[in-house]
């Protein structure tokens, strides 16, 4: 009898271990593609033949991109100033053009796959089970999280920061929301810094690589990526990032996924120095990008 009880105990223990391993793999490793996104490149006919490209700039009749490197707070900061003739050139893309759990791809790979001119990493929605996910007016996830702030990119190219809790994605889409990204927080709202030195201590007080997007006025955007976690570049707190973007004149600015995800890609090359949590120079695979292109 004791042997049988011991045997059943071993069997139960093995089953429990197997189940636990499966849950962990299913949550963090196994890729599950729920929706394949067929992105039609409807803007090809607007592409201009008159293109001027340098190491840090791109210009045609519809798109102007200028990249400048700054050095503040013992940190290397890369700023892309983007001016568009139409909001259709501000776009987003999923890894492998598929929405789903653990579906990831490097920012550079997504940029190249979508013929982007410029790109940064997005909100890495796949790392969380909650948070609104809206792309190109399609609601992929409507489960909200407590008090997280979202970035709404409207069809006219304007940006807004909203509180996710209580937000109605269907109503937002009806009102013109094209993309909703869920990471945050908002850095600048209505031309005022929206974080303080003492707020959101878990994020804001740590110096890290950062990615952010902001808008100065109609179709005039600022993208910022900072290096961090190295002796050469310390990284920014959220307050330092917000202050920096405010000084650039943005009216709205929003913090995207940072840390090892922070990547700025331009015209076939990575501009910043992506850094893992272990201090290794390596580009991380993520769920999505925000990009400029036709």
Regions found by a protein language model. Name each.
Residues 129-145, 153, 198-215, 220-251, ...:
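Conserved, well-ordered active-site substructure
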Residues 100-103, 170-176, 206, 232-238:
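A short, polar/proline- and glycine-enriched secondary-structure boundary/capping micro-motif
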Residues 58, 123-204:
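Active-site-adjacent helix-turn-beta-strand microarchitecture at beta-sheet edges
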Residues 2-150, 160:
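Zymogen propeptides
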Residues 95-99, 165-169, 226-230:
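Short, solvent-exposed aromatic-acidic interface loops
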Residues 77-81, 150, 186, 212, ...:
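Conserved hydrophobic/aromatic beta-strand scaffold that supports enzyme active sites
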């Amino acid at each position: 009898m004791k042997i049988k009880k011991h045997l059943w105990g071993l069997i139960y223990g093995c089953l429990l271990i197997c189940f636990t391993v499966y849950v962990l793999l299913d949550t963090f490793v196994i890729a599950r593609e729920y929706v394949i996104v067929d992105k039609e490149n409807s803007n090809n006919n607007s592409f201009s033949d008159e293109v001027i490209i340098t190491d840090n700039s791109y210009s045609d009749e519809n798109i102007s991109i200028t990249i400048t490197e700054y050095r503040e707070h013992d940190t290397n900061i890369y700023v892309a100033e983007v001016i568009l003739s139409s909001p259709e050139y501000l776009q987003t893309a999923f890894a492998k053009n598929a929405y789903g759990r653990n579906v990831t791809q490097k920012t550079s790979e997504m940029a190249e796959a979508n013929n982007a001119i410029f790109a940064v990493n997005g909100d890495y929605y796949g790392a969380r089970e909650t948070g609104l996910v809206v792309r190109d007016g399609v609601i992929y996830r409507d489960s909200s999280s407590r008090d997280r702030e979202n970035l709404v990119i409207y069809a006219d190219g304007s940006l807004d920061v909203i509180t996710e809790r209580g937000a109605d994605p269907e109503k937002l889409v009806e009102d013109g929301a094209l993309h909703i990204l869920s990471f945050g927080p908002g850095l600048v709202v209505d031309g005022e810094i929206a974080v303080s030195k003492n707020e959101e201590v878990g994020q804001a007080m740590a110096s890290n690589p950062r990615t952010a997007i902001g808008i100065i006025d109609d179709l005039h955007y600022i993208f910022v990526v900072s290096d961090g976690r190295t002796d050469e570049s310390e990284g920014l707190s959220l307050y330092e990032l917000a202050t920096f973007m405010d000084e650039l004149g943005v009216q709205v600015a929003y913090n995207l996924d940072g840390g090892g995800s922070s990547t700025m890609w331009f015209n076939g090359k990575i501009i910043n120095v992506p850094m893992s949590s272990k201090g290794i120079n390596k580009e991380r695979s993520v769920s999505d990008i925000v990009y400029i292109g036709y």
